[in-house]
Amino acid sequence: MTLRRRTIVPAVENAEEASGEPVKALSNRDNTVPPPVHQVTTSTLTWLYKTFAYKPAATDQNEFGIAGFLPEYPNQTDLTRFMKEFCTNTDDATFKVVRVNGGGYNSKDPEIEGNLNIQYASALTYPTPQTWWSVGGQMQVYDDTGEPAPGDVFLEWFNFLLGQPKIPQMISTSYGTDEKDCPLEYAEVLCKLFAQLGARGVSVLYASGDDGVGAGDCKGTSGPGPWG
């Protein structure tokens, strides 16, 4: 059996340094006035989605999970600082790290993607408990049938989750790949695993991409796409 491996590099690799301009905390903002358009903070998101008064319920039963598929790790000190500045001076938010398939974690080497994901998830869902999965492997590892093979991060992550007695009700990941780059068989297997999570009452959110929905080319070089 021949294994084919593709290494996907996230678009945030060369991201610019965030603006250092101070922003008012969420609790001090006038919710009828839109926040600065050149910054995306928790205030920006709560204004756009009109969720100023939202308070997470049943936080002793619910949980929010975030997947990390590359060595881009969050940092507790950074999270505490972010929450104090942008989430009504809350400073006790934490997250649990779970390693899957040999995934690593180095709190002394935080990266943009890891910090961004855990910080915004925590700010918008606090005090709901947060779990960070660090998944080892590579993106798009498939055999000569086109199906995902051991070592594929999505396959390893799905199989791990489905083997747990309890799974967070909401899961978010900002990693993905273009549909045209996936064999049909690969996509079908992963779709069935998604369905199994859905059958257990789990909602899985995926980012639309750094440039928004429809920014990529859905047609491959060898034929039309995407898969229907």
How would you name each of these model-derived features?
Residues M1-G228:
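Substrate-binding/charge-relay-adjacent region of secreted/lumenal peptidase catalytic domains
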